[in-house]
């Protein structure tokens, strides 16, 4: 298993962007396009924390069903989960998981 440092280097080479968050000092944001996920370094390598979501300003919107339709929701904000956004998030997750 590659070290977290090697995994991060490979993610950057693949076009992902890394970001730290004060509220989550032990984790690191991994972004590509409008998609975002939190990862945490462990002795076994990087581990995905929770579910990837859609970046909505400085917060991550999670995919939920509200009022019978899918939306990304974060702190009272909602964003329509169009088929294109849902597909982009699925591609992001699959690509990210291939590095973890």
Listing of model-derived features with the role each one plays in the protein:
Residues 2-4, 25, 41-43, 52, ...:
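Proline-rich intrinsically disordered, low-complexity coils
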Residues 14, 26, 33-35, 44-46, ...:
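Generic structural motif recognizing short loop/turn segments at the entrances and edges of beta-strands
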Residues 16, 21-24, 54, 72, ...:
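Phenylalanine-focused residue identity feature
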Residues 22, 27-29, 39-41, 57-61, ...:
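Generic local-structure boundary detector
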Residues 37-79:
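Intrinsically disordered, low-complexity regulatory segments enriched in Ser/Thr/Pro
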């Amino acid at each position: 298993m590659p070290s977290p440092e090697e995994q991060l280097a490979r993610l950057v080479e693949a076009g992902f962007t890394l970001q730290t968050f004060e509220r989550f000092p032990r984790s690191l944001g991994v972004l590509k396009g409008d998609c975002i996920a939190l990862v945490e370094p462990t002795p076994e390598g990087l581990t995905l924390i929770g579910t990837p979501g859609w970046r909505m300003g400085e917060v991550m919107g999670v995919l939920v069903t509200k009022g019978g339709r899918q939306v990304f929701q974060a702190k009272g904000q909602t964003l329509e989960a169009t088929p294109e956004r849902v597909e982009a998030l699925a591609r992001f997750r699959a690509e990210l998981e291939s590095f973890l």
